[in-house]
Amino acid sequence: MVPRPDARRKERAGERKVVKTPTWHVYVVGTRDGALYTGVTTDVARRIAEHSAGGRGARYLRGREPLEIVYRRRLGERGLALRVEWRLKRRPRADKLEIVASRLSRRALLRRLEVTEQR
């Protein structure tokens, strides 16, 4: 694929363009009926608003409002966030509730889910 002319890097002699990579979060949403939903995003508030509005939100959450963020943790890279989400979604409900209640730190969450930062 050939890059579009407007997508090419514009650099001047001695200057580098700094590309800011987004910080990814894992979050757990609680619903009116006590269900838990786990997801990842770069902007938790925006994503919850999308879930609440319907259109771009998860089908699982439709009709389950009000939604409440019960847990969120900043993880950094997208790959790490996806691995944590995958492990968290496969945990029994009791484990998820314990993680939410204990407010595990990033390091403790990774250790608990047996996820390493390196792939």
Feature map (PLM): residue ranges:
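GIY-YIG nuclease catalytic motif and its immediate N-terminal context
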Residues: M1-R56, R62-L75, G79-W86, R103-R119
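Short arginine-rich
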Residues: W86-A101
